[in-house]
């Protein structure tokens, strides 16, 4: 993914307008763990940017004709991941959108490649304690149907964080008003896309996207 500068006609525009112009037809993709707030923040971010919001999990359920827990139970996780990759590819091909991805979507190489090509990615980074508090009462998380959900969450974070960290922008997901986090997303997008500032790990090349070799 490449840092952008806005055209002179964008000077004086609101940050939201400038970000959409700098996206130049690309989508925004929110990545991160279950319970990080990707759908909640994504809807509000899309409204602020006047872009269409799409929840990948909802689209997967629509395409499969069954809820995600049933897909896992009936067909297994590999089958689910295959369908997830196809749905995300279709959605990104039809962009620009604000896309909330599933927690494990970026585990697939082809999905990481598609996100790097067609989207600017935002990692909503949440601590294990925050995630557990948000999801512990929900029965629609098949990967948490274990004897020790807290240990499962910590294991998944450890496995996935090296990939999440490759996102273009990182925003801490914590228990503050949603609009604060949306404001941070827009501010960081504006700095990265419109002012050419690096907003992720300072050691990382700003032209890099998701590593598709992992």
From Swiss-Prot:
Signal peptide: none
Entry GO MF terms: ATP binding; magnesium ion binding; shikimate kinase activity
Protein task: Catalyzes the specific phosphorylation of the 3-hydroxyl group of shikimic acid using ATP as a cosubstrate.
GO cellular component: cytosol
Quaternary structure annotation from Swiss-Prot or TrEMBL: Monomer.
Keyword terms, alphabetized: Amino-acid biosynthesis, Aromatic amino acid biosynthesis, ATP-binding, Cytoplasm, Kinase, Magnesium, Metal-binding, Nucleotide-binding, Transferase
PROSITE patterns xrefs: SHIKIMATE_KINASE
Cofactor note: Binds 1 Mg(2+) ion per subunit.
Cross-referenced HAMAP family: Shikimate_kinase
Record family assignment: Belongs to the shikimate kinase family.
Binding-site list for substrate: 57, 81, 103, 160
Enzyme class, UniProt record, top EC level: transferase
Positions that bind ATP: 35-40, 141
Subcellular localization(s) per the UniProt record: Cytoplasm
EC number: 2.7.1.71
GO biological process, one term: aromatic amino acid family biosynthetic process
Major location (coarse): cytoplasm
Functional pathway: Metabolic intermediate biosynthesis; chorismate biosynthesis; chorismate from D-erythrose 4-phosphate and phosphoenolpyruvate: step 5/7
Positions with a binding annotation for Mg(2+): 39
Domain of life: Bacteria
Annotated catalysed reactions: shikimate + ATP = 3-phosphoshikimate + ADP + H(+)
Protein name: Shikimate kinase
Required cofactor names: Mg(2+)
């Amino acid at each position: 993914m490449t840092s952008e500068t806005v055209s002179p006609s964008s000077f004086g525009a609101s940050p939201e307008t400038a970000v959409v112009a700098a996206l130049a037809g690309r989508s925004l993709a929110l990545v991160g763990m279950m319970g990080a707030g990707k759908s909640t923040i994504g809807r509000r971010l899309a409204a602020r940017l006047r872009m269409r919001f799409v929840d990948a999990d909802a689209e997967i359920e629509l395409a499969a004709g069954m809820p995600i827990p049933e897909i896992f139970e009936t067909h297994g996780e590999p089958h689910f991941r295959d369908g997830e990759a196809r749905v995300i590819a279709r959605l990104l091909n039809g962009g620009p959108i604000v896309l909330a991805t599933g927690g494990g979507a970026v585990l697939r190489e082809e999905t990481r490649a598609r996100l790097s090509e067609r989207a600017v990615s935002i990692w909503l980074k949440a601590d294990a304690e925050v995630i557990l508090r948000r999801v512990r009462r929900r029965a629609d998380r098949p990967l948490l149907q274990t004897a020790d959900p807290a240990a499962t969450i910590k294991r998944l974070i450890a496995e996935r964080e090296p990939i999440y960290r490759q996102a273009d922008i990182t925003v801490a997901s914590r228990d503050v008003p949603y609009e604060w986090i949306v404001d941070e997303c827009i501010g960081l997008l504006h700095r990265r896309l419109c002012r050419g500032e690096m907003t992720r790990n300072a050691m990382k090349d700003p032209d890099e996207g998701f590593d598709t070799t992992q």
